[in-house]
């Protein structure tokens, strides 16, 4: 009875040793030629696509930031109201408009909003996950624009 068990155990070991497959089949399935082809493909793609950092020079970025900063500057300072009404205000304004006519102000606000929309992405706020993430996500920038200047 011991000899059939010993013989089957030896046969099992022989089959295991001869037909042993690699422990990591992923490594065996990719050849060196495939890896070289993939590397060449990546090199060609990198040559065709310029990096974002190289696409815009630092001088161009600083000019864009200066333009956006000028467009986002606050409204001109208004002197404090003394409680007195000037004759021009009493008569309806110097040009026949009421003092509450805001066509100039709305035009100024429209131009500032257009400048804000045309501003570079670094000036816009990210609204990912409601603007605030807890613990790990807030520190790592996962899922958000982590490039903040």
Swiss-Prot record:
GO biological process terms, semicolon-separated: cGMP biosynthetic process; cGMP-mediated signaling; female pregnancy; negative regulation of systemic arterial blood pressure; neuropeptide signaling pathway; receptor guanylyl cyclase signaling pathway; regulation of blood pressure; vasodilation
InterPro entries: Natr_peptide, Natr_peptide_CS, Natriuretic_peptide, Natriuretic_peptide_atrial
S-S pairs: 128-144
Chain spans, region Important for degradation of atrial natriuretic peptide by IDE: 145-149
Signal sequence coordinates: 1-23
In-chain residues carrying the UniProt-annotated modification Phosphoserine: 127
Pfam families: ANP
Chain spans, region Disordered: 49-103
A GO term, aspect molecular function: hormone activity
Propeptide residue intervals: 24-121, 91-101
Annotated Gene Ontology cellular component terms: cell projection; cytoplasm; extracellular space; perikaryon
Processing after translation: The precursor molecule is proteolytically cleaved by CORIN at Arg-121 to produce the atrial natriuretic peptide. Undergoes further proteolytic cleavage by unknown proteases to give rise to long-acting natriuretic peptide, vessel dilator and kaliuretic peptide. Additional processing gives rise to the auriculin and atriopeptin peptides. In the kidneys, alternative processing by an unknown protease results in the peptide urodilatin.
Site (Cleavage): 121-122, 128-129
Keywords linked to the UniProt accession: Cell projection, Disulfide bond, Hormone, Phosphoprotein, Secreted, Signal, Vasoactive, Vasodilator
Family assignment from sequence similarity: Belongs to the natriuretic peptide family.
The protein's name: Natriuretic peptides A
The organism of origin for this protein: Canis lupus familiaris
